[in-house]
Amino acid sequence: MTTSTNNQTLTQVSNMTNHTLNSTEIYQLFEYTRLGVWLMCIVGTFLNVLVITTILYYRRKKKSPSDTYICNLAVADLLIVVGLPFFLEYAKHHPKLSREVVCSGLNACFYICLFAGVCFLINLSMDRYCVIVWGVELNRVRNNKRATCWVVIFWILAVLMGMPHYLMYSHTNNECVGEFANETSGWFPVFLNTKVNICGYLAPIALMAYTYNRMVRFIINYVGKWHMQTLHVLLVVVVSFASFWFPFNLALFLESIRLLAGVYNDTLQNVIIFCLYVGQFLAYVRACLNPGIYILVGTQMRKDMWTTLRVFACCCVKQEIPYQDIDIELQKDIQRRAKHTKRTHYDRKNAPMESGEEEFLL
């Protein structure tokens, strides 16, 4: 009786603890939405690659720890954006062997990038907090070498935290089913859901809300308003994270309560599965549009990304200047350089903060 109950629990939980789109219905849905998925993949890939290229190419000399965290956050979003359509296309063309690969691959991409992105967001908020509140006192501690070390640690931590979600699952009966022992099949799925709720949602939001509140109070009381734009960008990033991941985490929380209470209702189960799929879709949309938030809100980021885009566009398209116009072009270039030098001197003279304080987030 215990074995059958555990098997029933495992069957009921298989859809819940699998938080990526792996069921047969999703493969069929991909047939109808393939164009939209690939369009979002192209847009998300372009925006995330543009962010990464801007940080590595345009800002390589004045890169800050915040830029390092944003770059790796874009890498995590890029893995989610690229992973979904390619895994589903592979499943379409190799139906016999690919379901196992898709089951493990999608779970690995989803959870590793989830935990890594959370770590980078937390460090981004803490870095902004240190810059605004502590300022020069932490310049020796706050450097790119330490940020790179933290990035490596966070990626390793994300792989370890996501390991149960892709190593303990296999494709069985058209579903990505968790292979748990009979002794752990009742409580281990609840543990996984709770871990995602706390480590992947509640704790990061609480920490980022605390640091944001402290930064706002410090700026209002002690600093000028020129730092507020950094907080605007950070606030939009945090709010988008909380909004887009809320349905997914709510479904996990409801499923944990359902398992602990021992309630097995088909209607409730279908509602939770639907919420999980909606949450997964919103997470995918957020990974595609997250760089757009930087472009729309961050003035400095928008300028740097636009400059990078123009540089690479000019490299791809050769502009030939007629021989008789070379002197004119040289004179125009000298005038532009002189004008830029005067403007830079004026900006530095009247800047409210040092030029080294200017961050990619602004």
From Swiss-Prot:
Residues of this chain annotated as glycosylated in UniProt: N7, N15, N18, N22
Residue ranges, Intravirion side: 59-67, 127-148, 214-233, 299-362
Region (Disordered) location: 341-362
Keywords, sorted A to Z: G-protein coupled receptor, Glycoprotein, Host cell membrane, Host membrane, Host-virus interaction, Inhibition of host chemokines by virus, Membrane, Receptor, Transducer, Transmembrane, Transmembrane helix, Viral immunoevasion, Virion
UniProt cross-references to InterPro entries, sorted A to Z: CCR1-9-like (IPR050119), GPCR_Rhodpsn (IPR000276), GPCR_Rhodpsn_7TM (IPR017452)
Subcellular location: Virion; Host cell membrane
Top-level taxonomic group: Viruses
Protein's membrane topology: Multi-pass membrane protein
Main location (coarse class): virion
Gene3D superfamilies in UniProt: Rhodopsin 7-helix transmembrane proteins
Gene Ontology terms, MF aspect: C-C chemokine binding; C-C chemokine receptor activity
Ranges facing Virion surface side: 1-34, 91-104, 168-193, 258-274
Signal peptide positions (record): none
Residues forming coiled coils: none
Ranges annotated as spanning the membrane: 35-58, 68-90, 105-126, 149-167, 194-213, 234-257, 275-298
GO biological process terms on file: calcium-mediated signaling; cell chemotaxis; immune response; positive regulation of cytosolic calcium ion concentration
One GO CC term, this protein: membrane
Keyword Ribosomal protein in record: no
Function: Interacts with the host Gi complex without activating it, thereby probably interfering with the chemokine-Gi signaling. May also function as a G protein sink to sequester G protein from the cell surface via internalization. Plays an important role in spread of HCMV via the extracellular route.
Family, similarity comment: Belongs to the G-protein coupled receptor 1 family.
UniProt subunit comment: Heterodimer with US28. Interacts with host Gi alpha-1 subunit GNAI1; this interaction does not lead to the catalytic activation of Gi complex.
Protein name: G-protein coupled receptor homolog US27
Organism: Human cytomegalovirus (strain AD169) (HHV-5)
